[in-house]
Design a protein with these regions (language model features):
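Short, solvent-exposed secondary-structure boundary motifs
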Residues: 2-9, 80-95, 132-133, 179-192, ...
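Leucine-rich, highly hydrophobic segment in Treponema pallidum outer-membrane-associated proteins
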Residues: 17-19, 25-27, 43-156, 160-162, ...
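Extended non-catalytic domains of envelope/secretory-pathway proteins
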Residues: 51-81, 91, 129-229, 239, ...
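Single conserved position on a long alpha-helix in the C-terminal lobe of the eukaryotic protein kinase
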Residues: 1-56, 190-291
Length: 344
């Protein structure tokens, strides 16, 4: 009684009374009746018991932006969780990490300026400490991300401080698992000092591709490559590819890596990708997006137009999920740019 319901874009339920408006979703048609019952409970609840009394809602109230979001990291597609959980203790559950962000849409770009925190004191302290590790991004690699790449993460760090954060991050460890058995990535990361970019051209489970570029303070680890060659797991090998450049293969995974004369680390899943990791792309991401990255402490770019593989095959599930969530609310978007908001 007194509640009205409507369905928005076939997947969002809108419920309203004289006092409140509530939108929930996305939800499949079969589950809409059940969700409607849940929404009635929320709309009936008084202020002391309802959703507005929850800690997450209280946090939402503190954000002054016209459009704001508070979400658990686990609500995001798994493939995009890494930047938000960087710095948390090793076995942190993504449900314990919360993102509070202000949002704005300009020129088809959803700009999300957020900070991560936790209601768990130990995790919250770790996140605050991690935020201090990031330095302003100079923009060395913003032109290296091609416009058709799926996602890119940009930062400026001192490797020795960043390494423990990377080691305790499950998503990044999974990303590097195959390579780490033969190449001492930890030592490579330790030598980083400056801008670093990880770009993922595509992100299907059976086709993990990535490039990594970084400014180094030194490349002493090049002296260890001969040892790495002799200690490869069975069926794998490391071979020379060019001056201070090598490739690793185990039949399934390939990884090309090397150091330029001016101490830049470059790497990629194939020869071309690796070489171009530190060079400007012929078709880089939009200049507006580049501008949003430079000067920030941490940035992630997600290309929403990248909805199918280069051969036109199926949609990327993670991207479809994100677009499905955002399009009904914001209209057609081309990209999402997330930047870490650092408290002054």
């Amino acid at each position: 009684k007194g509640f009205h319901f409507s369905v928005l874009k076939n997947s969002w339920l809108v419920g309203f009374s004289d006092q409140a408006l509530l939108v929930m979703g996305p939800v499949v048609a079969d589950a809409q009746a059940q969700l409607q019952q849940q929404m009635v409970k929320y709309l009936k609840a008084d202020e002391d018991e309802g959703i507005t009394a929850s800690p997450m809602f209280e946090r939402l109230e503190t954000i002054t932006s016209p459009m704001a979001m508070v979400a658990q990291a686990q609500a995001l597609p798994e493939k995009f969780v890494a930047p938000f959980t960087l710095g948390t203790p090793k076995d942190t559950d993504p449900s314990q990490v919360v993102i509070a962000a202000e949002m704005d849409v300009k020129d088809g770009i959803l700009q999300v300026k957020g900070e991560t925190f936790s209601f768990n004191k130990e995790i919250d302290e770790a996140l605050k400490k991690a935020a201090q590790t990031y330095r302003p991004i100079k923009g060395s690699y913003v032109k290296s991300m091609p416009a058709d790449a799926l996602a890119g993460i940009f930062m400026n760090v001192k490797g020795e401080q960043f390494l423990p954060m990377m080691q305790s991050n499950r998503s990044l460890q999974t990303l590097l698992m195959g390579i780490n058995q033969a190449i001492d990535m930890d030592n490579i990361i330790r030598s980083v000092d400056g801008d670093m970019a990880i770009v993922m051209p595509s992100l299907t489970d059976n086709n993990m591709q990535m490039t990594m570029a970084a400014k180094l303070s030194h490349a002493k680890w090049l002296g260890d490559v001969d040892y790495w060659k002799t200690s490869c797991p069975a069926g794998a090998k490391i071979a020379n590819w060019g001056k201070n450049a090598y490739f690793y293969t185990d039949g399934k995974t390939s990884f090309y890596f090397g150091v330029t004369d001016d101490k830049q680390f470059f790497s990629g899943s194939d020869q071309l990708m690796a070489q171009y990791a530190v060079k400007p792309s012929n078709h880089p991401i939009d200049a507006k997006i580049q501008k949003l990255i430079v000067g920030q402490k941490l940035a992630m770019v997600i290309n929403l137009a990248k909805s199918s593989g280069s051969d036109g095959s199926g949609k990327d599930d993670a991207i479809s999920t994100v677009t499905g969530l955002l399009t009904p609310v914001f209209g057609n978007l081309t990209s999402v740019v997330y930047t870490l908001k650092v408290k002054r």
